[in-house]
Amino acid sequence: MSQLILVTGGEGRFAKILKEKNKSLNLYFAKKNQCNILNLNSIKRIIKKIKPKIILHCAGLSRPMEIHEKDISKSIDLNIIGTSNITKICKKFNL
């Protein structure tokens, strides 16, 4: 079996396409309640639990742009702070 890949944003638009199209990759789609990218301990827990070899970071806010304009702090938190947290954890776990 291929290496396990943790997909953040497992309920999002891109993850939905991956679920439909994927035929060969070993993907684990993390839901928000399993992997809160704003919480370092939440990210650590899922990594320790499923032991992925790769993280495919798909969590965050994207379109429509009105979402960002309506709540800019949420957009910054998810897209910048969340991504920074994923990067820190990847470095810590050598992923």
Mark where each language-model region is.
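Conserved Rossmann-fold NAD(P)-dependent oxidoreductase catalytic core, especially the SDR/UDP-sugar
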Residues: 84-95
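N-terminal Rossmann NAD(P)H-binding glycine-rich loop of SDR-like oxidoreductase domains
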Residues: 2-23
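Ser/Thr-centric signal marking residues that sit
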Residues: 8, 62, 83
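NAD(P)H-binding glycine-rich loop region in Rossmannoid oxidoreductase-like domains
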Residues: 40-78, 89
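SDR active-site strand-loop-helix element
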Residues: 8, 30, 55-59
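Adenosine-cofactor binding site in Rossmann-like domains, unifying the SAM/SAH pocket
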Residues: 25-45
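Alpha-helix C-terminal capping segments
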Residues: 18-23, 27-30, 50
